[in-house]
Amino acid sequence: MKNGSGNTNTKLILLHPYIQKQTSTTRLWLLAFVSFFTIVFLLTLLYTRDTIPSKNTSVAAAVAAVVTGGSTPSASSPISNSNLPTSAINALLHYASRSNDSFHMSYGEMKSISDVLRRCAPPCNLLVFGLTHETLLWKSLNHNGRTVFIEENRYYAAYFEEIHPEIDVFDVQYTTKAHEAGELVTAAKEAAGNECRPVQNLLFSDCKLGLNDLPNHVYDVDWDVIFVDGPRGDAHEGPGRMSSIFTAAVLARSKKGGTPKTHVFVHDYYRDVERLCGDEFLCRENLVESNDLLAHYVLDKMDKNSTKFCNGRKKRSVSSLS
C-alpha cells in the first residue's frame, strides 16, 4: 500500500519456529514421562501380586524374627539346643494357616510336621522339595537346625534367596513328565537291584528317577525330616513328583549316621502320582498318618545290599490327620 509521501512501508510478520518446536518437544517429554511411570506401575503391580509373599507369611516371618532375635544358624556358628517356645510355634501356625492364599496348608497338616520337628534332636536336618507359602514357617520352626529347599524354578529360587538370604535354596531341573509316572515307576522297580537300588549315592546314579545334579553336600547329610511339596504335579505335562519321592526314599534308606529313622511327608497325597510313588518307594508298611492331602511315613535305613524298597509286611495302623 502506498501513502501520500510516496514511501512504501512493508510490514513483516516473522514466525519463530523455535517456539513451536519447544512446545512440541515439551509435550513429547511429558508424554514419555507419563508413559514410563505407567508401565513401571503396571509391571510392579503384576510382579508383586505373583511373587511377593503374602501378608500372613510376612507376619509369620516377623514373629520368627522376634523369637530368634533375627539370627540364623550358619556353618561357622555353634547351634544351640534350645527350642522355640510353644507360644511362638502356635503363633506361627496360626498366621500361616489363616492366609488368603488358596494353596496354603491347613493347621492340622502343618502341626503334624511341626510336632515332628519339635521332637527332632537338634541340630535337626530338614529337606524340603518346593518353595511354597510355608517356606518361612519351616525355616523358623527348625531355626536351630539345617533347612534346605529344592526348587524347580531357577529364577524364583534366585529371587527368593535374594529377598530372604537366610534361606538355602538350590534349583534342580526335572526331566520327567507326570503322564510318564506309570512307565517310570515300573522301570525303577525292575532296576531296583541295579541303578535304581534303594541304598546308593545318588550323585553317581543313572536311575532316571534319581536326582543326581544337586550340590554334593546334599547327598552327604543324614536328613531327619524330608517334606515333598514339589515340583508341580497337577498338570499332565508338569514334571510330577516321581523323582522327588524316589530321591527322598533313597536318601532315607542310605543314611550313614544320625538317627536310623527318617520322617518323610508327602503333600497332595490324594493325587494318583503321589499315592503311587508313595506306595512303591516309601511303602505302605511305613505309613503312620495320612489324610487326603498329607501322608506321613517313617523309614528305617537299609543295608547297602538291599534290592527292595518294600518288604511286603502288613500295613501299619494309620491314624488320620485332623
Curated annotation (Swiss-Prot):
InterPro entries: IRX15/GXM/AGM. Expressed in rosette leaves, stems and siliques. Expressed in the xylem. One of its GO terms (biological process) is plant-type secondary cell wall biogenesis. It is found in: Golgi apparatus membrane. It is a single-pass membrane protein. It comes from Arabidopsis thaliana. Keywords: Golgi apparatus, Membrane, Transmembrane, Transmembrane helix. Required for xylan biosynthesis, but not directly involved in catalyzing the addition of sugars to the growing polymer. The gene is IRX15. Disruption phenotype: No visible phenotype; due to the redundancy with IRX15-L. Irx15 and irx15-l double mutants have a mild collapsed xylem phenotype, irregular secondary cell wall margins in fiber cells, uneven distribution of xylan in the cell wall and a lower degree of xylan polymerization, but no visible growth phenotype. This is Protein IRREGULAR XYLEM 15. The chain crosses the membrane at residues 28-48. Pfam families: IRX15_IRX15L_GXM. GO terms for cellular component: Golgi apparatus; Golgi membrane.
